[in-house]
């Protein structure tokens, strides 16, 4: 019975995982559409052209190519660049675009939510950043981030010392690997797209990279997950050391740190457990969040089902994919104890009632046998029944006698004389 219940719960979770994956695919597509729309804004293209030509920005690029020891000079160049009027105009433009997007949340709680919007030049240097929280002061402007996946489009971040042209920028829209913001220290992902400006010969040239970031937990599909016993989790399915990383979990929204202690950077499903989750049968799954100091709500066994999320441009037919794991995966998990405890409790109650019924039946049966046996024991047998003498007319009442036939003695012989 317990296996049947778990199998039923698994099938329910598998259906929910498919539904959640489809909903998330739609949301991901919205983010891609937004970043492409922003990258295609003509005003942004013109602003990027003017900023790219600033001497202070070129000075930063030249200094970064020199040997170590020019850190103070680079800082001075970055300060000059960030104080430039043209750079301020680019920042104000990005802030206005971000505020306009975020304003939609007041009327539509399910609207896309952004943490920041920023642009990089073709060499990977951030030229302007706008945050949803305007009190945040960026320390990223003027720094090179071409090692990030949102710039080069690879599956993982590269060495921080790498520079163009050793690494080339993306040519199409891209979803980055999870990374930690150098300013806010919050884990997030970025949607990025190249900024092209049409050229006179009918072609186009790259003038920068547009990127929008989303804090893990701010995707509409996973906002306000208040259920502690059944919920969906987003994980990174891309091959490599980050495969299985938990990108979104209800625990993150309740204040749990997104990083683990020790050498681990973030919570991650182990490869063996990730492989088992792909089997089309119920699996007892252990939530990695349970390892956190305050992760007691997620300890124990869970019944989990997994479903891939197909990003725009990914193969529709699973047989055409080179890797069975998608870039993103949805895990729907349900607390095994909460699921099976009612069944176990019912079994205990039925066992108690069964034992009680047997005891009552035994008492009733024993009582009946005792009554019958006692009744049978009081009933006289035919040989012991007293002889009843019916009174003759001369007697005043009948008398009962127990007569015993005995041989008469000589003096008791009848007298013939009488």
List the predicted regions and their residue ranges.
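Membrane-interface helix-start motif
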Residues: 1-3, 221-223, 317-319, 336-357
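Intrinsic low-complexity, intrinsically disordered coil/linker regions enriched in small/polar
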Residues: 60, 160, 205, 217-325, ...
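Extracytoplasmic/periplasmic sensor domains and loops in membrane signaling proteins
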Residues: 80-100, 134-179, 206, 251-299
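Extracytoplasmic/periplasmic ligand-binding sensor regions of membrane-associated signaling proteins
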Residues: 103-118, 129-222
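Cytosolic-side ends of inner-membrane transmembrane helices, especially those
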Residues: 353, 357-378
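Cytoplasmic C-terminal tails of single-pass
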Residues: 378-418
